Amino acid sequence: VISRNFTVVPLRKQDKEDSRMRTLLIGLLTCLVLLGLDRPARADLDSYFRKPEPVYKWEKTGEKKVDGGTVIDLHLVSQTWQGGVWQHRLMIFRPDKAVRTDFCTLFNTGGGGSDGEITLGMTAAQITGMPFAILYNIPNQPLYGGKTEDSLIAYTWEKFMETGDESWPLHFPMAKAVLKAMDAIQAYTKEAGQTEIKGFVIAGASKRGWTTWLAGASKDPRIKGIVPMVIDTLNVTAQIPHQLAAYGKPSEKVQDYTSAGMQEKLMTPQGKRLLALEDPYSYRDRLTMPKLLVLGTNDRYWSQDALNLYWDDLKGPKWVLYNSNAGHGLEGLDTQLRVLNAVGAFARAVAGGNPLPKPTWKYGFRDNFSYLDVHSDIPIKSAKLWFAHSDTQDLRDAKWASAPMSPIDPANPTHGVFGSKGVPAQGYTAIYAELTYAQNGKAFSLTTQIELMAPKK
């Protein structure tokens, strides 16, 4: 519940023979509609995921012992998409000291992997206390004349709008590859005589975070939790005008979409159909599994408070972790460790370990001060109030600072904290709280939403 005593930035006749002929024509058209022959080939998310993939296969290409565990290398062929066979590197990191061996965190990413990422993968496995896997080459690229990343996604959206072929949107094969990676991991562990992997936490960043949402929407019972990172654009039809109100024009980071006229095209009937297929917000009633949203402040792709356009509509257990001054890349070793620790706590909780805290928060505004009260069912080890200010709604270049929060009740200091920040007479102030917890000697952080406010006029 949020007390809104302040101005919040708005997050928009003929003869018998002719009659018989007309009746026959109507009947024929009705049959065509029922048969689906009146429209282009359809491939909604469910049918795309169900489509058989005869090329699917995997093989083990390597195994080596490293400090802290074992790394297994697999080569995965996931599917055929638009005539091309998708291939991936799939690395599995098994820690020597595992809390659970029947659960796996699966991180999907781009690139082809490097030896330098072995340390990161094994560190993640040790922190989570269970196998950790990295699926590479999401998506397979470059394609169509060298297109990669956002230019490739924008191209596939245009192809959908031109053809009506619902298998074109790139996130579909990206998400299906994740499902096929789960198949491969389970098949490998069975063949190797290892403990069967029964549950997965799926994670990924940016467009791979979008992939994470859609994989979760598959209703695959193996997916027990999801961690979408730095993909703060659910409810796209509301996000577009919200960003324009904040920035005055689309972010420079979405130039590939702007150049293709996507902001306008997405408001057309074909564009709305695309979003019904692609926008994870369309699948929110399915996304009831536990979810941890990892975001960076100053992420230039999205409006700073974009989460507030969909957070309340997310079903099931949910948590958020903002990372101050971290941007879209979640830069900095401290940030990366904070993210790994939070993902570890989340994965352990989803796998049946200690449940995560359930913080609740309430914002208020009084006497030119913004207030934030936070309550927690589990003791809080420490709490910070993060704040930033800008003359406009554009906080992309704002510098975030923090101050300690104080107990609401000194007699019960670890279950409730508050913080306040003066709001200047001009401009906009954003605040959120970071809460640090400790479970079984492992520290991790969670945060509240960001609230962006201006003095009440």
Regions found by a protein language model. Name each.
Residues M161-S206, S218, I223:
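Gly/Ser-rich "nucleophile elbow"/oxyanion-hole loop immediately N-terminal to the catalytic nucleophile
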